[in-house]
Amino acid sequence: MAFHSLLLLCLAGLAFVSETAAVHHESEHSKCPLMVKVLDAVRGRPAVNVDVKVFKKTEEQTWELFAAGKTNDNGEIHELTTDDKFGEGLYKVEFDTISYWKALGVSPFHEYADVVFTANDAGHRHYTIAAQLSPYSFSTTAIVSNPTE
């Protein structure tokens, strides 16, 4: 019974993250080629002040810092990059989960949650990376769309 409740909670949270990310992606921020959204699954609200770093894989096969930011009151980061700078390549979005949970007085299992993805290999796209966090798990989803003119 507890498993079913937990499963329903996770599914509801994923639906919430997917819906809110899609709504915001089509708003005034639709020209932003990379947007991040983070939800605190324990408290059922946006995760505020989560440090996020974006890395790009270099030709030498190392990760180079590409962009960084901190989630706002809506759990979002916009304007991490511009269309001109966000070229084809392999990217890694790193969510600093340990600092977020420790600031709330919680000892989490994960120190970071990483999402690695290939961008713009099939033409220019806009990406929303959404993460749902809890102290012992995380899940992510992505919305990939054509730019809005």
From Swiss-Prot:
SUPFAM superfamilies the record matches: Transthyretin (synonym: prealbumin)
Keyword set, alphabetical order: Gamma-carboxyglutamic acid, Hormone, Secreted, Signal, Sulfation, Thyroid hormone, Transport
Listed transmembrane segments: none
Modified residues (Sulfocysteine): 32
MF GO annotations: hormone activity; thyroid hormone binding
Family matches, as SMART domains: TR_THY
Annotated family: Belongs to the transthyretin family.
Oligomeric form and interacting partners: Homotetramer. Dimer of dimers. In the homotetramer, subunits assemble around a central channel that can accommodate two ligand molecules. Interacts with RBP4.
Known role: Thyroid hormone-binding protein. Probably transports thyroxine from the bloodstream to the brain.
Record protein name field: Transthyretin
Organism: Macropus giganteus
Taxonomic lineage from the root: Eukaryota, Metazoa, Chordata, Craniata, Vertebrata
Gene, per the UniProt record: TTR
